[in-house]
Design a protein with these regions (language model features):
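Conserved nucleotide-binding/hydrolysis micro-motifs of P-loop NTPases
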Residues: 1-2, 28-29, 108-110
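Acidic, metal-binding active-site segment of PIN/NYN-like and related structure-specific nucleases
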Residues: 87-121
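Short, well-structured N-terminal submotif of metal-dependent ribonuclease cores
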Residues: 1-26
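A generic structural signal for alpha->beta connector loops
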Residues: 19, 66-67, 118
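PIN-domain endoribonuclease scaffold, especially VapC-family toxins
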Residues: 27-70, 149-165
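Short, basic, glycine/proline-bearing loop/turn elements
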Residues: 66-80
Length: 190
């Protein structure tokens, strides 16, 4: 869920608005930082700029979600037999945190029979839909907050542009339709 960036921003904005409880470990955040730096290098950023921007992202997440950091998960790492041992830390952190879901588009590496009962493995698109359908007003607030944060380094984005990006890049059409309905409510004939 923490990759790619617009999807991450939307899902974290939902958490910030109170739509769900976001939890992560330092190991997860370290992966985000490394992947963000690699992405920026591939886009042509200078190494020191890529590293600084990636570090800023991780630091900002630690600050904004300081009560979401899961600790003491290490003892469970390696005890689930997941197909990719590098994903064990994600499941271990979810178990320790009492999470109800792991949001990932890497579904094949979290076979249901290897995941403890009570933890659902769900795609980012499905999670966004479930979350916004339960709290449409928080979905709208999340996108509005994203829009307000734009314009510092790049052109500002309207809510409609962010919704279009969520549709086009992440297939979140069902989710964005709920939000659009709040923006443009239809009136019943009467």
């Amino acid at each position: 869920m923490l990759w790619p960036s617009t999807q991450r921003d939307f899902l974290l904005s939902l958490a910030f608005e109170g739509a769900y409880r976001f939890v992560f470990s330092e190991a997860i955040l370290n992966e985000v930082e490394v992947n963000e730096e690699i992405k920026r290098l591939e886009r042509g950023d200078r190494p020191e700029d890529a590293q600084a921007k990636a570090h800023h992202l991780a630091t900002r997440m630690r600050t904004v979600f300081d009560d979401s950091i899961v600790r003491d998960w290490e003892g469970l790492e390696g005890s689930y037999g997941l197909p990719d041992p590098d994903d064990e830390h994600v499941l271990a952190a979810a178990v320790v945190a009492g999470a109800g879901s792991i949001v990932t588009d890497n579904l094949r590496d979290f076979p249901p029979e290897m995941v403890p009962a009570g933890i659902q493995i769900v795609s980012a698109r499905d999670f966004a839909y479930e979350t916004v359908s339960m709290s449409p007003d928080l979905g709208l607030a999340a996108v509005q907050a994203m829009s307000r944060r734009t314009g510092r380094h790049h052109p500002a984005l309207a809510v409609s542009e962010i919704l279009a990006t969520l549709d086009k890049l992440y297939g979140m059409n069902d989710t964005t339709e709920i939000i659009r309905d709040l923006l443009h409510p239809t009136t019943a004939p009467g």
